[in-house]
Amino acid sequence: MKTNRKRVVITGMGILSSLADNIEDFRLALLQKENGITDSARFSEWFENARAAEVLHEIDCPELSEEIIASLDNAALWAYKVGRDALIQAGLVNCPRCLDEMGLIVGVSSAGTEAFLPLFEQRIQDFSLRKAMYSGGFSSCCSSVSTLLGLKGGVELVATACTASPNAVGMAFDYIQNGKSSAMLAVGTEPIYLPTFAGFYALNVMHPVSCSPFSGQSGMSIGEGAGAIVLEEYEHAIARGAT
């Protein structure tokens, strides 16, 4: 049976990692073979030879109020940041009509953990009920990001551990290819939290030195960050002058 599948193109990207917080600097860091895996001051308090690719630079979102930022966990804040960067690159951030039709799919693994870390780490005085209310749910980042970015085309959460982000991209692709949406924002976001690091450490799967692609090392290096891409139906992108 003949099917009329739509063509799908990528029109915007955003990135946040231990190497950079924008696409151009990230690309240059990769070309220069920079290594973002370092000794972790955060986890060295708990574990020996603690190494990770951590996001250490400050996240700059001047368009958000301090009150809003305080209510978001890193999973939501990072997802918002890379999502907005992708919309800016796509030329859609100031297009209300386009945002009204755009859906959001977010891939996560341990979202909702941060608000309760003070309880895990015996820092009861740092526990915030407001943050727990806004960011304590597993899918809280979806509602936060869609609201802050003005996306009204529906939201979905993918929680399939290490495959969450590519699954989010695949689902967004399917929505467009099958004519269910003309544009989608796919986001992956994952901070490293103490329970996650402790779990991999207890399994003895982390290598004491930095891993690299095809290095053949008998272990892994854990990292954190976020990424986003805007996917559009080809004719939709051409009609609005996307490049």
Describe the role of every protein-language-model region.
Residues 181-182:
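Short, high-confidence coil segments that cap the C-terminus of an alpha-helix
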Residues 1-153, 177, 193, 201-221, ...:
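Conserved "HGTGT" condensation-loop signature of ketosynthase/thiolase-family condensing enzymes
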Residues 165:
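Short conserved active-site loop signatures built around small residues
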